[in-house]
Amino acid sequence: MPSSDVQSYATLREDLAKRDRSLREKVVSLEEAAGLVRDGMQVGIGGSTMSRTPMALIWELIRQGRKQLSCSRCIVSTDGDLLFGGGVADEIVTSWFAQGILWGLSKVMRHHVEAGDKRYQEWSHLAMGMRFRAGGMGVPFLPIRSMLGSDLMPLRPEAKEFDCPFTGEKLLLVPALNPDVAIIHVQRCDAYGNAQIDGLQFMDIDLALAANSVILTTERIVSNDQIRRMPDHTKIPFMCVDAVVEVPYGAAPHECYGLYEPMMKHMEAYVAQVNADPVEGMKAYLDRFVYGPKNWTEFLSLIGMEEIVEASRQGRSMYND
Amino acid sequence: MTSSNRYTASEILTVLSARALENGQLVFAGIGIPLLAATLAQRLGRPGLTILFEGGVIGAFVEPGKLPPSTNDQRCTKRANMVLGSADVLLLLQRGYVDIGFMGGAQIDQYGNLNSSFIGDPDAPKVRLPGSGGGNDISSLTNMIVAMKHEKRRFVEQVDFITSPGYLRGQNSRTDAGLPAGGVFRVITELAVFGFDAETRRIKVLSLNPGVTAEEVQDNTGFPLTFDDGVTVTEPPTNEELETLRMLDPERLFTA
């Protein structure tokens, strides 16, 4: 389904009514979780840029050869490179797509988008947020006051200019985005999927509410008792969640707030390799770091203990005075 | 391009940008020079300057030597007043809480429109650029300062694609398009500081950077420039400004 198609309210309600929303254990393996994402789905990705990227699940989707996904995320960095280069996604819906401000343009994105074999569907950052929020609210659109007058508006005919019935002012209506599945990485959750997110939450709460299913990867699974001691830290409630996977360092080589910062040596080597040759460089990266390792922990060992320890030291220093 | 070897182009760009910010203002800053300039302003006697980041941060005080690699990294939250969702921090712009939006730019035109999406035809682009991010929202919803490198290919009569609106086609076209609030009011480069004519909304030179001639600015601009009646010469960066800046970015991530 094209990502711009707004689902009818009846369809949204029927799909949600079919889900088992009860308080039940949902822990599965990374392989099983990736199996819940099927070819052609619209996949919402949690986190932003280099932060709390559900990298282990993306890595597993590439390994399983998933195809023709349309992926949406507020801001995309090297995860988008891997989704295109790994053959998983045909389309990425976002507001910004590069490897990171430190490195300039993504040659991988440029290669695929300029050749026309992949699509980058651009919205403003606020528009992405209001699309997920409308999806999470069960309404078909929300009005915003940006994108008006710019060339982004004609680029996105899915958004409709509209005269406000109360004031007569011009507004832009952005369509709800209800992904088939959301994949979100968090610091901790229980076996039921009550997820506690430390630090920046980005658009993850709206995304979880909007999606027709949610897979959580988590640094650790804690007891329900522990969740109940700090219910104000719970950002995504269990009834949104369909699967839970415990993956320590599951956002590597990106960061996870309070635990580890981006693994910059790995990132720099990656960027140099794929930007030198977005096809062969990417293929070599995938062979070594995605297809090569027998599991996620072996991937981490390829990043290297020294870099992981340093990223963890920096990550935890957030809590130093 | 600077006439002095005391500082790099990025350094004078950052120093002049910091000077444009006042204590007490709420500034929505993009990554790179804007973040660095806003942080520099805080360190140079304007601690009441509140920095907002699109990752979802209100009131950051970035640590020297620990500049975040994007506005979505944990380093952006250090000593902040509040962390909130990305859509919610952008909605503060829409509600009108933010005094100044502060961005870099890849390509700008005579009406202050910015392009960060496409070089060439959007249907078959020569270069697909990263896109808007929060740029379109910031420039649509608040008064804006743009800090950017001054090159002929970046200063063009008309951008290939308006990602982030300035004054669109000049005169009242921005308001008529449904953008009654905000608009770019300063463009700062390593050569000069620009404002916009109150009526035509066309860019004009307000002041020249130290050691830079009017001809030099014109030669590096892709359209005929207007010079304000009382064009002044900007005071060079002080030692204090440069030393503080170098303390903030010792690895020269953004000021090389």
Where are these regions (language model features)?
Chain A
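Conserved alpha/beta enzyme-core scaffold
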Residues: 1-321
